[in-house]
Amino acid sequence: MRSSVLSLHPDRLLPADPGTRAIAGRLYAQIATLPIISPHGHTDPAWFATNAPFADATELLLVPDHYVFRMLYSQGIDLDAIGIPRADGMRAAVDPRAAWRVFAAHYTVLRGTPSALWLNHVFHDVFDLRLRLDAGTADHYYDHITAALQTPDFLPRALFERFNIEVIATTESPLDPLHHHAAIAASGWQGRVVTAYRPDPVVDPEHAQFAGALQQFGALTGEDVLTWNGYLRAHRQRRAFFAAHGATSTDHGHPSAATADLSPAQAQRLFDTVVRGAATPEQAELFRAQVLTEMAAMSLDDGLVMQLHPGCFRNHNRPLFERYGRDKGADIPMRTDYVHALKPLLDRYGNDPRLRLIVFTLDETSYSRELAPLAGHYPSLLLGPAWWFHDAPEGMWRFREQTLASAGFYNTVGFNDDTRAFLSIPARHDVARRVDSAFLAKLVAEHRLEEDEATEVAIDLAYRMPKRAYNL
């Protein structure tokens, strides 16, 4: 069967109504080529430190992308067949080309999803491919992409510059020595790659490696991390180290948004239980909650912006987790409370202008009921953009519709891509810019905004807001 042409319509994601589409097109034209601010994500700093070529199409575009392989798995594709590493680091003996052929043969499963939008953008604009990916073009794609990746124009730093990225933030464990960030800074390359402090490994008592991570935390800092005060001093020390390597933010991926405000004596007693390995699930939750409030206190001193990404049931598929480990597409959104959960922290620090807490959600029902009213009141609180399962065009639109009335635009932080998939970053930002242009055009067409106001908001959302919110 003959493959069809791959094309990107210039008006994709803009309104169907001609008049509104014309307004959206004018707005989009003002922001389409603005530099990319990527204030939160999971790209590998080693890429930019070593500037080594990416290996092949499969290793770059398929293996790291859980958005893609979770959909393949849902259709009965064994993860071994596409080369996904197992929990022990080993892989099935599958040729990368064979894995790519499996992906191409099932590419139709992504139709209509944001992954298809992003990947088609990558194929068309980054690799200049003009036939759609399918079983018949699988080898053509694999050979073309893999060959391109060995050329100077496709080295990580060249792509960073080609993508017009002004700054990108990676996310590291408190145990990370940040050697790659130091190497980037010492290299003389002008690309700006900063880190972010993600203390989850030494904050979650229910993590299988918590005890070992805590021991490493103490060895790394020289603090007695088996005492509450020593544990807090270790965090302060590592936060300062991260800030010295460019960090402007912290990130916290907790099961819930719970916070607490315990007395020092209560916190010490709880910590004693935690380090003995005797914490109940309720005590583990209380410990995570107290640490969040302690992180807020530290932010008052060191200025690091807090990000909270709660409400995900991690590793829902137990047999898959046991075989392949974490981050294999089996994370599921949960109902999440914010009004009661955040109150202890907000009672303590929510009115202090030195604190900036950016809250995300996987529970869309909380947008208008809880999060927008909270962000529309507390000076310390901002709303992160539609996240993970909701960063599709429809999810971005729902986010704007449900938060605008109570939070406005200026209690949000613009867009962040939150991705491991480096080559998709321009596509993700382009989708967000198109959706925001369409949303603003509707307000102009309804005479709720003047076009010059909408233009200013569009520029703010695409560029100024993330820089300001993340102190970049």
Swiss-Prot record:
Pathway: Carbohydrate metabolism; pentose and glucuronate interconversion. Pfam families: UxaC (PF02614). Disulfide bonds: none annotated. The keyword Nucleus does not apply. Keywords: Isomerase. Its EC number is 5.3.1.12. It comes from the Bacteria. It is an enzyme of class 5 (isomerase). It catalyses: D-glucuronate = D-fructuronate; aldehydo-D-galacturonate = keto-D-tagaturonate. HAMAP family: UxaC. This is Uronate isomerase. The lineage of its organism: Bacteria, Pseudomonadati, Pseudomonadota, Gammaproteobacteria, Lysobacterales.
